[in-house]
């Protein structure tokens, strides 16, 4: 689904692409996941890579492991890591699910 979205942006009318590219060059994120890209194409490439990386990680860990890792990451804040906060609040995180499948 996401790759179709990026392909649609690449195939957008020239005028629309120029407008998005100008906004990207001013520092605006115009593609979800394209943070820090300095042009429309750069943002699309970054977003595609991040999406593929996440999908690969999900395949390696399996759905349960990926969800468990997200649960731990979602607990982190600027003061504490996810593991510290989980321990502090009594939330159980099963890190055995983080192991990659062989």
Curated annotation (Swiss-Prot):
Tell me what this protein is called.
Answer: Late embryogenesis abundant protein D-19
Assigned protein family:
Belongs to the small hydrophilic plant seed protein family.
Q: Which domain of life is it from?
A: Eukaryota
**Pfam families registered for this protein in UniProt:** LEA_5
Described by its record, this protein's role is as follows: LEA proteins are late embryonic proteins abundant in higher plant seed embryos. There are two subsets of LEA proteins (5a and 5b), the first ones are expressed when the cotyledon weight reach 80 mg and the second set are expressed above 100 mg. The function of those proteins is not known.
The conditions that induce or repress this protein are given as: By abscisic acid (ABA).
Other remarks in the entry: This is a SET 5b protein.
Q: Where is this region: Disordered?
A: 1-102
Extract one GO BP annotation from the record.
Answer: response to abscisic acid
Biased composition annotated in UniProt, kind: Basic and acidic residues: 48-58
């Amino acid at each position: 689904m996401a790759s179709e979205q990026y392909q649609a942006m690449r195939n957008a009318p020239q005028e629309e692409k120029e407008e998005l590219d100008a906004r990207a060059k001013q520092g605006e994120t115009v593609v979800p996941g394209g943070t820090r890209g300095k042009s429309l194409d750069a943002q699309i490439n970054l977003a595609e890579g991040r999406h593929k990386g996440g999908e690969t990680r999900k395949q390696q860990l399996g759905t349960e492991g990926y969800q468990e890792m997200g649960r731990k990451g979602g607990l982190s804040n600027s003061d504490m890591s996810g593991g510290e906060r989980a321990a502090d609040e009594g939330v159980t995180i099963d890190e055995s699910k983080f192991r990659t499948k062989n």
